[in-house]
């Protein structure tokens, strides 16, 4: 039996809002609070993601944060698929989860960079595309040995791969929005990489 349009719209809105709030549950922030009684945002880069958590907690903290952030990015899209919601709602849940990770309300809009939850969500939405994006990540990592640059390459490549693989417009557009969000979150890193590159040429 089909839900009435208004009721279906409320469910969609609830799922999208829930995805944002879930995204704001920053794994690295809570792990560092638990293990060190410190605010990870006052350490290193100031981000709550896996790379910065790893600076404070070591390899174990990095891996736990990476897995936690990827899982939370996957959860809302997985629930959307379970309840057979529309592709548009599914993609909006993916975007909202990543937005919550980058700009968490409960942490004063100071979160992570968004790569791990984005890749976790993409894995649920389109496993084949996620595999191709992972290939881009590994290729760039092998060339540069830079985790941040490799993650950016994978995320920027995702909407292009989606178009090449003739995926629905909503998916390709949503992945482009994700890429913009993640670029914004990495703007400081990008400036630093450009400055280093410029200094090497001198």
Swiss-Prot record:
Subcellular location, principal: membrane
TM ranges: 8-28, 85-105, 122-142, 146-166, 173-190
Keywords: Cell membrane, Lipid biosynthesis, Lipid metabolism, Membrane, Phospholipid biosynthesis, Phospholipid metabolism, Transferase, Transmembrane, Transmembrane helix
EC numbers: 2.3.1.275
Keyword rRNA-binding: no
Cited InterPro entries: G3P_acylTferase_PlsY
Pathway: Lipid metabolism; phospholipid metabolism
KW Iron (keyword) present: no
Tree of life domain: Bacteria
Lipid bilayer topology: Multi-pass membrane protein
Location within or outside the cell: Cell membrane
Catalytic activity: an acyl phosphate + sn-glycerol 3-phosphate = a 1-acyl-sn-glycero-3-phosphate + phosphate
MF (Gene Ontology): acyl-phosphate glycerol-3-phosphate acyltransferase activity
Pfam families from the UniProt entry: G3P_acyltransf (PF02660)
Gene Ontology CC: plasma membrane
GO biological process terms held by the UniProt record: phospholipid biosynthetic process
The protein's assembly and partners: Probably interacts with PlsX.
Membership in a protein family: Belongs to the PlsY family.
PANTHER family: GLYCEROL-3-PHOSPHATE ACYLTRANSFERASE-RELATED, INNER MEMBRANE PROTEIN YGIH
NCBIfam families in UniProt: glycerol-3-phosphate 1-O-acyltransferase PlsY (TIGR00023)
Listed name of the protein: Glycerol-3-phosphate acyltransferase 1
């Amino acid at each position: 039996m089909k839900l009435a349009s208004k009721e279906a719209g409320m469910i969609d809105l609830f799922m999208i809002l829930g995805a944002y709030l879930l995204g704001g549950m920053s794994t690295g922030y809570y792990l560092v609070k638990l293990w060190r009684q410190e605010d990870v945002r006052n350490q290193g880069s100031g981000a709550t993601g896996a790379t910065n958590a790893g600076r404070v907690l070591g390899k174990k903290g990095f891996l736990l944060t990476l897995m936690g952030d990827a899982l939370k990015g996957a959860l809302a899209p997985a629930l959307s698929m379970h309840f057979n919601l529309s592709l548009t709602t599914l993609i909006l849940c993916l975007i909202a989860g990543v937005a919550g990770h980058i700009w968490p309300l409960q942490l004063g809009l100071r979160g992570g960079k968004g790569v791990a939850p984005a890749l976790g969500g993409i894995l649920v939405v389109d496993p084949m595309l996620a595999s191709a994006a992972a290939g881009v990540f590994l290729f760039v990592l092998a060339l540069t040995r830079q985790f941040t640059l490799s993650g950016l390459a994978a995320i920027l490549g995702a909407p292009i791969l989606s178009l090449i693989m003739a995926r629905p417009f909503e998916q390709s557009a949503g992945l482009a929005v994700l890429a913009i969000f993640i670029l914004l979150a990495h703007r400081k890193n990008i400036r630093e990489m450009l400055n280093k590159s410029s200094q090497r040429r001198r």
